[in-house]
Regions:
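Terminal targeting signals and extreme-terminal segments of soluble enzymes
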Residues: 1-248
Length: 248
């Protein structure tokens, strides 16, 4: 979805600063039709909407919208803000480097998966076959906050590897998995949405998530992640969770 929002007409002069994804229906393993449109035009601020449809095009009555995303695009600045960037890095140093100083891209314990017929991480899927995940703190199915470096092993759209904003958005979906508060055999955690806000362009092939998950008696949770690349902080991600006990 980030690739569609970023690449829509006029995107070369704009930065995709926020991506919000609404997961409307289960996404089938079948061809999908994409639609992208400009919701709010502007020279400095734009809103772009992208949607994915199953069983036909958006104009087909039989088609079903399965995913919708809104992208906030801001005009790329032409002024030299080097001094401001350096000042911000200095005053925020203690906070910004909390996770990044603990490890470097490509280091940490490799997350491996054993396949079975169960639920969650025991199944084959994107988490096990499309990404490389390395933990400097925590692990999948280890309860509590976690810090993880991840990279994509395969292209998402076309043949080119995902980089920049699309890479950060794709890996931000792992916030809850990095910081789960219980095991997936007992509870299901459904990501109802995902919002990723970035203050600069990510660089390199690795993205770091420093994540924590909070839950309530309402059966609602929130997975929050501080995002980093090899040069430091790039933004934050948040996913709203629906919690349900699994059938015994």
């Amino acid at each position: 979805m980030a690739t569609l929002l970023e690449g829509f007409e006029g995107g070369d002069t704009m930065f995709l600063a926020r991506t919000t994804v609404e997961l409307l229906r289960p996404v089938p393993l079948a061809p999908l039709v994409a639609r992208v449109r400009l919701v709010r035009p502007g020279k400095k601020v734009q809103l772009v909407e992208a949607s994915l449809w199953a069983n036909g095009s958006p104009d087909d009555p039989a088609a079903t919208e399965v995913v919708r995303a809104i992208g906030l695009r801001l005009r790329r600045g032409s002024a030299d803000a080097h001094d401001l960037v350096q000042l911000a890095a200095s005053v925020n140093a203690d906070v910004d480097r909390r996770a990044a100083v603990q490890s470097e891209p490509g280091t940490g314990v490799l997350q491996e998966f054993e396949y079975d017929e169960g639920v969650g991480f025991g199944r084959r899927g994107f988490h096990a076959e499309a990404v490389e995940l390395r933990f400097s703190k925590g692990a999948m199915q280890q309860q509590g906050p976690g810090t993880m470096w991840g990279r994509l092993l395969h292209p998402i759209v076309g043949t080119e590897p995902a980089r920049g904003v699309p890479l950060a958005v794709a890996l931000s979906d792992f916030g809850n998995a990095v910081s789960s508060v219980t095991d997936m055999d007992s509870w299901s955690f459904i990501n109802a949405d995902l919002t990723v806000s970035l203050h600069r362009e990510p660089v390199g092939e690795w993205i770091c998530l420093d994540a924590v998950t909070h839950v309530s008696n309402l059966g609602v949770g929130l997975a929050s992640s501080a995002l980093f690349d090899e040069k430091g902080p790039i933004g934050r991600a948040a996913a709203t969770l629906l919690l349900e006990p699994r059938n015994p």
